[in-house]
Amino acid sequence: MKKRIFESTDTNVKKFVFEWGDQPSEKKGVAEAVLYRYGEYRKRTVICCSVMSGCPVGCTFCGTGKFFVRNLTKNEIVEQVRSCLETIDCGTRDIEKFQIMFMSMGEPMLNWKELKLAIIELADMYPTAQLLISTSAPTGMIYHLGELISFSMQIKRLGLQFSVHESTDEARAKLIPTNTCTLRQIAAMGDTWAAFTGRKPFFNYCVNTDNNGADDARRLASLFNPDVWECTLSVICEKDESVANSINRQLDIIEGFRKAMEDEGFHLRVFNPAGQDDIGGGCGQLWYFQKWLKSNL
């Protein structure tokens, strides 16, 4: 395995790139993980890691595109986290808020077998870590919700987030062309998760010029009960747009939409776009993967 580290000028964000295939026993593949520091590592540390090399889902804004190389193994997922933590200046037990999120490259629920094993190992290695699965909710997920809930009873620090991004199924299907659950099905899964686990589900919403109106906020509130759900508003740099232009434009849009969502009763958080402008630290910006594809496939 080869490992490269790219550090943002922000100094609070590092991207880790892992390449496999230089040994006869390794299958070719590349994955990216991002390490975030909020103030100090001791205060809050977040790792976003990959579950696949590439992704078959094909979200239209994502730099991974429709390219899929292979699923990552349990060991390859765990190695991303371990490598990131080698570079911080404290032990994980000293971190006030430590989060491991499966939301960099790949759809977690399409590599559930290996991800489940990785979560078990990571929960044992890092007993203070909060773990989060972020999913687009592929169609088959609805049939495996019971298994996921049962597993979450074993791993009680496991959270669940859905990539929603639009307030109607028609608009969402254009953004995420692969078959996924409907918004009502996603809402029902999250409600069930909350009822059985006692943990609030999250939905992630990428705000753009076409989905930030009061009608969007009302539709979301009618689907996702604000008393049950938490919402994250995200700045996403589309693969063909200037990062600086994207961030400035979308942060302005988010401020207006935040008020509409708060009026509907939602408790919100806004994703910090640190590291998107120079190392591609955000979703949809996996530029090293695209470069690797040109050389290897």
How should each PLM-predicted stretch be described?
Residues 1-28, 191-201, 205-297:
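Auxiliary Fe-S-binding modules of radical SAM enzymes
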Residues 1-51, 83-94:
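N-terminal [4Fe-4S]-dependent radical SAM core
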Residues 37, 161-164, 272-274:
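Residues at the C-termini of beta-strands that transition into short coil/loop
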Residues 37, 53, 63-66, 237:
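A short beta-strand motif that forms part of the nucleic acid-binding face
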Residues 43-47, 60-196, 200-209, 230-234:
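Core AdoMet radical
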Residues 49, 71, 180, 247-251, ...:
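Short, conserved loop/turn and helix-capping segments at secondary-structure boundaries
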Residues 51-58:
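Cysteine-centered iron-sulfur cluster-binding motifs in ferredoxin-type domains/subunits
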